[in-house]
Amino acid sequence: MIASALAGCLGGSDDDGGDEDVMGCTYADATNYNPDATKDDGTCTYAEPEPEPEPVMGCTDPAANNHNAAAEVDDASCDYGRSHADIMADYAAGTIDFGQASYELEVSRKCREQGSNNPCEIVEMSIGDASTIDPHDAYDSASGDVIEQVYDTLYRYAGDGTGNAIIESRLATGYSVSEDGLTYTFTLRDDVYFSNGDKMDASDVVYSWCRVLGYGSPDSHVGWILEQSFDCNDADGNHDDMGGASFSVISDTSFSVTLFAPSSAFISTIAYTVGAVINADLCEANRVDAGGENDDYCHEWMDEGPMGAGTNAYTVQTWVREDRLVLVPNWMYWESGDYNINRHTVS
């Protein structure tokens, strides 16, 4: 009897048990999660995973014309335009005009900015404003800094990498000297164009050097650099006789000049900016009182570095004196390669 009584006290009845489990989905990341469930019943369902976003397709090469900075995967669509050489060959052949050539060259050669560490535009604080952009009457450094970017010479000064200066060829491809040391015969590049598309030839060089003597550089007197070496007739624009006995135009790419006396420094003198080559036809077209007492030898026109006057890498877009000067590329520039600066402001 004792055993039966103890059993009844310890076991209790079935109706007297604890709370029943609440069945349901107990996983919080399930779409049917039940926060009240105390026991998982295997019914959890889950949302379909979000699909991976499609990568942005496009040209990923910063050097291409159609570079897409947002592109993640290259789609082989990169366009580099036609080469400088091919465009200029078509221009020389007359297949395309100046407008088309300029457009294609800009597309092909322009700087493409790749973030703040590779800007295509720079602003430079100058030591002072240029006095003129006429290379045949400029002697100051501020003018020279601009002139060297707009006009070119047969030879120029350059560094040799060790701190010494050397002279390297630019518009000339070479020269020879007669046995008596008096006559220099130059050969010129045949692929040089002024910024307006006119082709440069030997008569432009003769005209330019004789203009220095004819105009006389009244403000700077820089003309003495050439005056000591040779003379001309009167730089009146007659390409057949303007050089007088000193000059001979042999062909479009060759001419000779005879000096007063042998000079080992002659190449050095013509490497200075006073030896720059200008567009003879445009200068003649813009002379004031040509042949008269007030002949300006196109100085008023040349003073601000007009379009078409030079053959170097840049042209003057804007010049507000004592404020700013803006240089932009001469897309017709003869050296191959792309530009790393599309706009150079000097202020």
What residue spans do the PLM features occupy?
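Aromatic- and charge-enriched surface segment that lines or borders ligand/interaction sites
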Residues: 173-221, 256
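Surface-exposed binding/hinge segments that line
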Residues: 187, 221-290, 320
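Gly/Pro-rich hinge or "lid" segments in bacterial periplasmic/extracellular proteins
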Residues: 158-162, 262-339, 343
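Short, disulfide-bonded extracellular cysteine-rich repeat modules
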Residues: 38-47, 72-80
